[in-house]
């Protein structure tokens, strides 16, 4: 025997603190069990846990309740001390001994599998106490996996053994709780003679006359000590009264639960209670020595073995000396060269045993192996997780929209680092705090606090990008929109690209949302098509899945304040369960509902004084906050495989409930502490290793104190295992900075924690406004708990990773906690050798492209250390690509920035790529430019290219041709390369190049091959197999070598046509080998003839070039090989082509209908290569056109030149390789061109060879083309709840039409009705009426008077005031807001003013909602052409809101004045200003109220003074409005910053027009506005009106559309005037579209004039009167009363109506409905399809399916139906 092994199992868990040492041991086993290298350990622990749970279920209720819940058997280590006080303590310790010993044994041998080579002949097992059970498991199992299979039975034995011992011992001595409470059952006595001790015990028992069951007994001696067992009272008497033992050194073993090894109390009946029947497959395999007899146990089965062991453990005295003696004798007899004592843990027995062996066997080498230490030293993380549930979760991307302008993670960090508190009064776009807040709490349904923390501009959204129509966008909850946006940004941050790595079918979304404010309040004011899908919570994550085409689950989670952290946990759980491979998760909260404020305020949740004062003595509740955030999660191993940036790693997550709290909303510190311990166990970490806890910390007294208590008790306990002084616990909460985001609170905390890891700084806690809350634990400093009032550095430890916990409490009682570990740095393991990189930028719109370019250039220039390779990799392989594109080739980031910068200016004029598939032709080169080392760099670096080359070379060698690899690698001299090898190398490299391009996503639409290149072309087209192509090329070349004499014939390239050559060449014989272009011909013949011909042609002025080739290909010289070539290749099989082949042999295109066989290729060897003729035929046939892109497969671009010169309109012809140029540089140039041409490229495959050298960088996110989609909450109906406020005047029910009511703008009231809180007015005015002459003629456009939009505004003011005066009590005063005004078709005054030119006005008021819908109808055209909504509001609240902007506006006015003084801005007089304005509008003196104008590009101010006389009877004179507001139009039409020579700008709409005080005659005002670009050639601005230094009026979001000046005559021409020619603008053609200002909506029916009944009264005595009645089926929505958009001229009526209908329903400009416009891109979905299909059926009589619009692709498809 060369080596003997003795395995020793002791009888206990390692000594020491059970909550320290033991936890560390079991924690290590837990972590190892999660790794793929330890499957048997994982199986073993699962089996032991399962068996333990089964045994637990068998217990009686009283005992079941003693055992705490556990997920793994290892969790019970946390409860050892407590369990010792119960009847289960001993049983649990026995099971933990088993789990520790066998777990360590298995882990060690899984790490060192070769060491598990135990044989019965050289291995002995010895053990003591419960260690015998562990030894039995090993003895019964010849292989390691079998230990796991028997472990369930061994676990049951261990547990039952403990139960029996406890049961028996309690029957001997009463012990109500801890079995050892009265004293120890075992004493260890040192330094006594065993025999004398035995005799002393015997005498003592006899003297005391104990019953046998109460006697003491010696059950073990090991030479150094004696163990005595017995009831505690007996042993206490023994050691206090017995003279022999009083003087001994003895130790009571109080940790040992009970006694055994005594036949006085145990018998076979106890053995039978313990031992289950075990499957007979387990037989004794290794010798196991009895600690009683000292001999190997003999057993016929596992059951037999365990019964023997248990009988000895219960009833027999241990004789360890016998065991040692017999084992030693066995070893001596075997005489091994060495012995190894394998012990689970160090012990005195191991040392004594080794010492004895060394004395008895001095010539033998003796070693020991401490498995426990070896296991503790095993590295973690060296292998992948064994399964999904064992994985760590990587956070790979994040994005946010948080309060205080924190629109991305970096801005969020700046806010935290600066210690900012961003709470503010509730913005007016949410609701009016003047009416909805009552600090006294007396007004019903109001909030007591006006504060919150709010996201900037929550309505901003890029609807077109996300395929949503403007209508759908407006009706969709902004928090769901922002969830979609942040999901995109987080995915972009993570480098996710569809089709790369994670499959879309394996991605899910999980979002927390706990309110529906927008649906309940904002969109609920006017329920539309998208009320449900736009507002219900399930659609939030569902819309994300739908947009990105994710197939995984989408969950909306509501657990109140912990919703988003619970959603993150749900996402992690889905990853752990294997349901998904990637999750996008987060939370959302946008506040608009005053009811929630009122409810929380009345429920005493909210602070009445402002922000969250967490841990402050004055904490008085929380401050509400907006917030939307998204993170991207993957299993760690997947993230590493995908080369992602890992921001942090989730180790464990869990949720429990504060079910025992005093109320449902009250936290419970015990439940919270239980949760923290649970996640720590799952994570396999020591809670004291956690360095930072991001707490819930809302600033409520109950919540803060309970959470602090639970956190400190677990992570910084005051007793027992406490924190080291150099390891403080920092705590913080984001809520002190930006409030409580409620459903978004968890994602705010989570993102903050990611940033804390990233920055290595814990930002200051700013919640302490006065002093620390005295309710917090007094010993925080002693516990080493730090609340950082200033920023604290969180030092990275080299030997362990930093750990943090994020904690959330939900108001409904849920607690969610997540343990996060910092990400380990990942070194680069290779090098990117490419000299130049392709930098790509793209967008869906020109504006976004420009902004993307600006942001990127700024980003690059600010980071000199940036790697250009990382930049290229991020922007190409890890970003999505769109149709507006820019790409540059750069060798450095500085060069990249300089090349990108010029594109910023040109990007707005860029034409997008259509998205249609561009035809790509692969052209395969001949042999004329051969060189050594073709594709050398690709072969070296690209696995894909190398794979194909190696496969092809393998085929070459198997056909008995020489390898061509030396030609590729460059390891050969040119003269040593045969024709055969050269030809094979050329063709095989071309095939490999084609396959490489295909891996890049570039696949050929057609192929053409030149000469030798035809073989590669046919292989790529599927005609020839690779093997057949190699065989044909090799055979042909071999025949050429053997049958054709080299260098007797040659080839001559001539820059002339064949006809010119024939004419100039005289009688010199030659053959035309190749026709490469119109004036490019290759000739063949004898060398002498070629030399003569060269001289002759040169003399004639033609350029010639002799080709360095050994033969004259495609001439009669080839005749010598044709017959033999036919014979040798007749078995070659040719298939039908899969793509068109442009054939130079036949000079035509060949398709799958053409037959190609070997004769084709043999003929091609001999016959002329008519490359130019083939190209010409392809062009004539339409296969090739201007858009075709040519990609040359070959070692040098020769065909590219032929193609460009033959087809002069060729778009581009690009090379794959180029002589004397690095392969990667050539590829990069070509890819750059392809990308710019709109070709989809698989950049991941391009970068794959170097990916381990590349890193994803945090480049700027996509720049959105945002527009504000926001439905404003109007009025105060949330307060009234059906109770009208103010009360309606009860006397006003039905009002007869007043004959006396007439103003300058409203000439006649047709009808006026007031019923049930509603009012309906119909009125009429005539544009030709003398009362309007001044304001209409004084506002002339194109030379004609126009009823301006401001005149229509005056009408709205007048009718609204009429309704108010008649409906409300006289004491009530309102401000009138003319809002959502849209003016779709101008009203131009007729030339013949003798005829009336009426317009009808309808006003419908909802007096409870305090709003009036006003519409204008043009009877002459039978269209509703204008509409607005008037709101009655409190002007004092306007003034209050505007006052916050006063400083900003006045500062801009002051700046403009200063610029005028210095000449930087233009100051214009009245005459000059209106003269410039005259380019578009001819203003009469009545209108010329601007006294001076200061103009600076897009910004202006005007000093305005009104005349003393209003010139009529007005509510708000239209020329007064014009004098203030037309400054916005002057910037565009009168200045020089905008092109108003070729264009003009007119306003179709504004969002709101409000004047808080009357515009007084003679009054002096200041107007200020800045106009900024919006969508689709439009501009928008807010006009501020100041009286003195106070803002008294605002026109918000006034919109101007840009139109070509040639349209002016079309827009502004009276109906009774024929069209006059418009002035032509050079380079401009007149559009064929009938103009309309803005996309708008349809009137299903024209209005009807219905006679009034006599009893309704009439204003005119000569008329029965009329009212404008609502048409049948008319919706009260004002959109339905508008005119259809106008389609292009020249269409049939149905087509015009259909396109107008589509534009109306999608709320898009009809100009966007071009033939190739994609329906889906315009925002169409299934709901909109139903609506439009129904309308086409009803209004046009078309028979179409509901799904019609989902089945068509473009507008052209719709037109095809209508033709």
UniProtKB/Swiss-Prot annotation:
Name of the protein in question: Non-reducing polyketide synthase PKS19
Region described as Disordered: 1619-1690
Region described as C-terminal hotdog fold: spans on this chain: 1461-1609
GO molecular function, one term: 3-oxoacyl-[acyl-carrier-protein] synthase activity
Domain Carrier: 1689-1763
Keywords assigned: Acyltransferase, Phosphopantetheine, Phosphoprotein, Transferase
Annotated spans, N-terminal hotdog fold: 1307-1439
Modified residues (O-(pantetheine 4'-phosphoryl)serine): 1726
Organism per entry: Phaeosphaeria nodorum (strain SN15 / ATCC MYA-4574 / FGSC 10173) (Glume blotch fungus)
Ranges where the record places region N-terminal acylcarrier protein transacylase domain (SAT): 20-261
Domain (Ketosynthase family 3 (KS3)) ranges: 390-822
Chain segments carrying region Malonyl-CoA:ACP transacylase (MAT) domain: 922-1227
